[in-house]
Amino acid sequence: MKAVHFGAGNIGRGFVGLLLHEAGYEVVFADVADALISQLASASSYDVHEVGENPAVKTVSGFRAFNSASQEAAVVEEISTADVLTTAVGPHILKFVAPVIARGLAVRPADLPPLQVMACENAINATDLLHTEIRAAWDDSAGDLDAVAVFANTAVDRIVPNQAPGQGLDVTVETFYEWVIDRTPFGGNAPKIPGATFVDELGPYIERKLFTVNTGHASAAYFGYAAGLEKISDAMADPAVAAKVRAVLEETKELLVAKHGFEEAEQEAYVQKILSRFTNPHLPDTVNRVGRAPLRKLSRHERFVGPAAELAERGVTPAALLEAMSAALRFDDGNDDEAVELTNLLSELDAAAAVERITELTPTHPLFPALQKLVEDRQAEA
């Protein structure tokens, strides 16, 4: 069995690539980072260090690696005969890898079963987006795209912090992980990945992860940044910050239980597990790394506005989520492009226009007045 994986970074090596290797796949990494690909191509193995409860070191070997820009022909050939294709490149990069994937699918031998494609990105329905981008790049003379590939959405969860200098290809990750895959597109032929969980309805799991893990992690980052703390574990060790994060997750728990029918005790246990992960002192994750890209994190269907808007539509005032968004508006890390852009927007636009631009909500939405007040308060500080 062979799996082509786009994105040879820390998540690709320390999460998706590891699970594919453990499932028995020969992993072929594709990336445009030339130095990284050169390292992988010349290495026989790398280690994944799992830290936290039950720490372990796992070795990944038997992989190959290609530069998908300068060695495109080789990547196309690998895709044409692969069993599985995965990505961990970031949702905004999918449009750049789609043409290469389309070319690989176009020359896939007719006697092979459809390639099983799964985008493992920190975004809702990322595989649907990849499918759309591949279709846009598809040459209709090659036949029916859906005859040569099957696309399944996934939800992925593993904290992979910035790595210490000098680690080389080795990756440090938390022990916890979750890879949930929609089994329905595969019919009865789902890929054999023992480390993954296959479900018939993925939507509730995607939202549970996004509105608990991502919302909580970003909340800890922004509250921690406001408190002058450096690491996420430092932030969660601060009683005031921890209480604010807990309050945020109480609100998202209320929404998830009401909307998706999760048992309250089950969701509470999930929240407790997530909070314990954030306190892991072995993960040197910084508030600056987790808080980066605040504009994306404050967008309409993301981790803050998404649940807050739904709660407001249900007649609930999401006070804790609003406090987290207020902290996000104050994330002014000069090394982060989106933080700089956010600061500029807040100085250039009036409050109502800024809310519309940042959150994509209309002034008639029930959450809009509260967000406008947050922005007005932030602008008054400037």
Swiss-Prot record:
Keywords: NAD, Oxidoreductase
InterPro entries the record matches: 6-PGluconate_DH-like_C_sf, 6PGD_dom2, Mannitol_1_phos_5_DH, Mannitol_DH, Mannitol_DH_C, Mannitol_DH_N, NAD(P)-bd_dom_sf
Organism domain of life: Bacteria
Binding site for NAD(+): A3, V4, H5, F6, G7, A8, G9, N10, I11, G12, R13, G14
GO cellular component, one term: cytosol
Presence of the UniProt keyword ATP-binding in the record: no
GO biological process: mannitol catabolic process
Gene Ontology terms for molecular function: mannitol-1-phosphate 5-dehydrogenase activity
Enzyme Commission number: 1.1.1.17
Catalytic activity as recorded in UniProt: D-mannitol 1-phosphate + NAD(+) = beta-D-fructose 6-phosphate + NADH + H(+)
Family the UniProt entry places it in: Belongs to the mannitol dehydrogenase family.
NCBIfam families the UniProt entry points to: PRK02318.1-2 (NF002646), PRK02318.2-5 (NF002652)
The protein's name: Mannitol-1-phosphate 5-dehydrogenase
Organism: Paenarthrobacter aurescens (strain TC1)
